[in-house]
Amino acid sequence: MNDFLKIKNDGASMALNAESSDKQEFGSFYLSRYLGFEISYKNDVCVVKFTVKSPMQNPQGTLHGGIIATAMDVSMGHLLHHTTGAGATLEMNIKYLLPIKEGTVNCEGSFLKKGKTIGFLQSHMYREDEKLAAYASATWIPLKK
């Protein structure tokens, strides 16, 4: 199959998965379904796992930095929501260390410090070979209920 058909077929599959539900809630919202995110929690860590598909790649054939940033943001935001309630990102800093070309990716969000009015979180993204590909730190503010 040529590259164009692979991207077209993968993109159609991703869209069908996202359209499978109209839920817009933590753990299952349109963008997470579209990107194929599997979200789980272990102890004080939120794990976002997904498989790299051709529509997620940039023209160089590696996972697009925006997808990496999205997965890391989701891992931290979902952890905050899971432990203390919904919040919003005030700032996020990302370091890209290694390219991700294919395979299954694991992203782990955790707390650096839980404050009363501000949360400091971090996220680490690992390639399928378990090498650290990117890491992020972020400042979050809890949203009032």
Regions found by a protein language model. Give the residues of each.
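Terminal targeting signals and extreme-terminal segments of soluble enzymes
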Residues: 1-145
